């Protein structure tokens, strides 16, 4: 547990940056020196934090390029004093174009209208704007399909002033599954798109397709760059071999016991008196609620926290507080800490166990942890 003297907040997340550094070393060893690792920091690195992690990756792990989901994430990183290359993976609304051009943000290009607007802004400012062409290999989201669609795009953008086509990429739809037929087809589709780009006379510095599962499982699809968020923070749920890189989970989340109530058998409590005590109970009121980002489908559905090294079922969760059953845990006191997720000392709440009955993924869980939860970064 951390020394919280002088720190405000009803719950807190600890992120161990040295564990991130060790994870980076293991990822780089896995992909080899001829492949570049591009850390993905979208969604505030899935709730782990944004600016501090970006700064650490550049200053301590020697990264010269990061990627994010939206322009505003790139802006936050720039405002923190981080001046490396930043690639925005998501679509860029046209009102963001002046910012990305002025601040040297690389964006995703998948349609000619965006390319023309970006070109006009770059020419107006007397500069160039870097882009990565997105190829739709099957996911059906952003990107141009190889064939006539990509040919038309290349015809429209080739030679546009102020545009530097630095790279091309795709995003696999199914790289986590045992069956490899889909990823093989999507890689072949991506290859055909790269061939079209080359035939159009465009030389690419970077080609990338591998997300987290593909980075671990399919070295043949690494090209010269791979992207991952989850590997960075210690999660690899590869179906054929769990955590084969030996990564370390970098985050844990703790809250507090705000009050302890004695509840008699048959007594009702919670909003709408929705809960009824099945026996004489001790119920701890939590210092956190769903507005802190804890998923609302876990209470009463296998969700639990660790209190004094023992599992305590979550009975219900309100906006700012909730109810936890501590009847069978002795000597619990007000202000004792609860572990919500991660490992701290001998206590651990393992994500796959916690989410066993949930409809949500691990990335969803972490992305929900909001700004109200204090982040503590250990360097």
Predicted features along the sequence, with ranges:
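Active-site anion/phosphate-binding pocket segments in diverse small-molecule metabolic enzymes
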Residues: 2-16, 21, 72-73, 92, ...
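Active-site-proximal beta-alpha core segment in soluble small-molecule metabolic enzymes
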Residues: 6-7, 11-22, 29-206
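Short secondary-structure boundary/capping segments within folded domains
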Residues: 28-31, 275-277
């Amino acid at each position: 547990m951390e020394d919280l003297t002088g720190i405000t907040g009803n719950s807190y997340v600890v992120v161990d940056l040295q564990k991130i550094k060790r994870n980076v070393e293991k990822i780089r060893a896995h992909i080899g020196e001829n492949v570049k690792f591009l850390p993905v920091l979208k969604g505030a690195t899935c709730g782990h934090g944004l600016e501090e992690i970006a700064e650490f990756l550049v200053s301590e792990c020697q990264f010269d390029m990061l990627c994010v989901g939206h322009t505003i994430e790139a802006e936050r990183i720039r405002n923190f004093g981080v001046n490396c290359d930043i690639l925005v993976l998501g679509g860029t609304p046209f009102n963001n174009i002046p910012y990305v051009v002025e601040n040297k943000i690389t964006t995703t290009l998948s349609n000619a209208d965006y390319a023309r607007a970006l070109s006009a802004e770059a020419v107006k400012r007397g500069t160039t704007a870097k882009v990565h062409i997105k190829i739709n290999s099957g996911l059906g989201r952003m990107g141009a399909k190889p064939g006539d669609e990509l040919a038309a795009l290349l015809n429209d953008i080739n030679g546009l002033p102020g545009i530097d086509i630095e790279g091309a990429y795709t995003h696999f739809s199914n790289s986590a599954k045992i069956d490899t037929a889909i990823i093989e087809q999507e890689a072949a589709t991506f290859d055909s798109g790269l061939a079209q780009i080359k035939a159009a006379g465009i030389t690419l510095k970077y080609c990338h397709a591998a997300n987290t599962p593909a980075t671990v499982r399919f070295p043949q699809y690494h090209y010269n760059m791979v992207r991952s968020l989850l590997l960075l923070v210690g999660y690899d749920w590869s179906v054929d071999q769990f955590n084969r890189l030996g990564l370390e989970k970098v985050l844990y989340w703790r809250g507090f016991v705000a009050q302890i109530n004695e509840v008699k058998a048959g007594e009702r409590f919670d909003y709408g008196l929705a809960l009824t005590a099945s026996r004489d109970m001790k119920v701890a009121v939590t210092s956190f609620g769903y507005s802190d980002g804890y998923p609302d489908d876990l209470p009463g559905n296998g969700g639990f926290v660790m209190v004094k090294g023992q599992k305590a079922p979550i009975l219900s969760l309100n906006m700012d507080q909730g109810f936890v059953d501590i009847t069978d845990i002795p000597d619990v006191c007000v202000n004792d800490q609860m572990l919500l997720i991660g490992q701290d000392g001998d206590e651990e709440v393992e994500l796959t166990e916690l989410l066993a009955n949930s409809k949500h993924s691990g990335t969803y869980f972490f992305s929900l942890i909001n700004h109200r939860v204090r982040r503590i970064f250990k360097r």
